[in-house]
């Protein structure tokens, strides 16, 4: 198991919002995507080794642990390692609970996590396929009750 830090939700969210206000949401999202990608890769690599997991089991384990840590409830709706695709539903988002209906996709911090996890699993299988992730909806948006994240293969210039 990896060392953990535990902080109150309001403490983390308040710090997150302060950095977003200072940098701008777009810049902050880009920074968090890359940092989250790297962290997810590392976490999945270490946990797979520790627990003898591989493939989809690594991704499912990651979603379970994220859910247990209080970020929200992450549900893998679909995953296809051969295609490099995945769809994750987020219920009970810590961001949506703390911030309410803002009209924005507030959970962008999580986006790089899904591609990082998927790519580590693919690399462990010997695949050169790499992915990108995007948030398509948030419980913080009007008319939405859950967040949705989609992972798809990198193509063309994006590689």
Short names for language-model regions:
Residues 108-125:
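Active-site helix/loop of acyl-thioester processing domains in fatty-acid/polyketide metabolism
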């Amino acid at each position: 198991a990896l060392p953990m830090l535990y902080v109150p939700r309001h403490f983390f969210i308040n710090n997150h919002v302060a950095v977003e206000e200072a940098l701008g949401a777009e810049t902050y999202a880009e920074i968090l995507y890359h940092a989250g990608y790297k962290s997810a890769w590392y976490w999945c690599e270490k946990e797979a080794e520790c627990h003898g997991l591989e493939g989809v089991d690594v991704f499912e384990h990651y979603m379970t642990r994220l859910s247990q840590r209080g970020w929200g409830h992450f549900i893998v709706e679909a995953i296809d390692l051969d295609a490099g695709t995945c769809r994750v539903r987020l219920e009970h988002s810590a961001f949506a609970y703390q911030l309410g209906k803002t009209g924005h996709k507030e959970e962008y911090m999580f986006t790089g996590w899904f591609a990082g996890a998927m790519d580590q699993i693919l690399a462990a299988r010997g695949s050169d396929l790499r992915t990108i992730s995007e948030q398509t909806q948030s419980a913080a948006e009007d008319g939405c009750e859950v967040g949705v994240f989609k992972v798809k293969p990198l193509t063309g210039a994006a590689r």
